[in-house]
Amino acid sequence: MTQYASPLLQTLLDTDAYKLHMQQAVFHHYYDVHVAAEFRCRGDDLLGIYADAIREQVDAMQHLALSDAEYQWLSGLPFFKSDYLQWLKTFRYDPTQVQIRNDGGKLDIRLSGPWREVIMWEVPLLAVISELVHRYRSPEASVDQALAHLEVKLDDFRTMTDGLDLSAFRLMDFGTRRRFSRDVQQAIVERLKLEPWFIGTSNYDLARRLSLTPMGTQAHEWFQAHQQISPDLANSQIAALQAWLDEYPDMLGIALTDCITMDAFLRDFGPEFAGRYQGLRHDSGDPVQWGEKAIAHYQQLGIDPLSKTLIFSDNLDFAKAIELYRHFADRVKLGFGIGTRLTCDIPHVKPLNIVIKLVECNGRPVAKLSDSPGKTICHDKAFVRALRKAFDLPQVRKAS
């Protein structure tokens, strides 16, 4: 085995909360749906040389299982039903669902299988890739360096917020998938826990062990899969929003808006959805324009924006979060999710810009168009054209 072949992942819960939240909904509503997903490196990194080391980690993941203590903890949360948790106790990663190869220097990964199982691969696999690559590239970087740099940023934060009322400022860790390492993420979260404005983490394992609130609702794949689950493409986003409420009628009500674009989302987000969902999450496009559109939409529907929450999570750092807080704080409730800029922010370390996105559902194409053209993902140009037509969208450039 290689130098770093000891398993990087120690628990099934070392993943983002929305994966379990979506998995339960899939378990209850779409048990037999099959999907395929693919890895993308949005940067110019040639990661193919790590394919064998990644395969070793993937093979080791089949031994992860929910512990009795973890099961009891999940049982005490309001989100989960007993039939799902009983099934989750039996869940094991199936490495045969993951194809990994070095394609001329580029890392090529494809996941396929039942959605209820494949849904679990994305976050831990990205975290493994990130940690492996950084171990090879930056073996001298340390937890202490990460913490020291965080203190510099916190000093800057205190300076830029001097005299600012932070009573409504809420920040959470969204940094699992592109973290420098598991140890760095834990150290960063433990330090941030001391701050009054830090409210939780997307990582279920850290939430359990550090007594924090697990944060997260649904991801793009929830909306993408409905493009093929729904009999009518034009109503697929409505179907996704309704199915989520069927599973979670009065909780986990933050809706992601940019699978098809914000404008298309708001056309589907009518009075009932806007009333029942607790808020919206921004993940692409201009955040100020997006927030203004959201507030105007609520106002047009006769809903007080201060009764709703806007979550910002697109490439945030402390400075961007405070800029948005200053702009919106007196008009709507706010939350800020910072990922890479928390958990992989060490001097001289270049974070990876890597994603895994759904590309097929039941053997047919799905797409993410988003409010940032460079984030658009789909192989099938004909399907993208059909999607644009169904949602009355302008031309959107496909990402390479």
Swiss-Prot record:
Keywords: Ligase, Phosphoprotein, Pyridine nucleotide biosynthesis. It comes from the Bacteria. Belongs to the NAPRTase family. Gene3D superfamilies: nicotinate phosphoribosyltransferase. Catalyzes the synthesis of beta-nicotinate D-ribonucleotide from nicotinate and 5-phospho-D-ribose 1-phosphate at the expense of ATP. The keyword Phosphoprotein applies. GO terms for biological process: NAD biosynthetic process via the salvage pathway. This is Nicotinate phosphoribosyltransferase. The keyword Metal-binding does not apply. Pathway: Cofactor biosynthesis; NAD(+) biosynthesis; nicotinate D-ribonucleotide from nicotinate: step 1/1. It catalyses: nicotinate + 5-phospho-alpha-D-ribose 1-diphosphate + ATP + H2O = nicotinate beta-D-ribonucleotide + ADP + phosphate + diphosphate. One of its GO terms (molecular function) is nicotinate phosphoribosyltransferase activity. Transiently phosphorylated on a His residue during the reaction cycle. Phosphorylation strongly increases the affinity for substrates and increases the rate of nicotinate D-ribonucleotide production. Dephosphorylation regenerates the low-affinity form of the enzyme, leading to product release. Its EC number is 6.3.4.21. GO terms for cellular component: cytosol. The modification Phosphohistidine is found at residue 220.
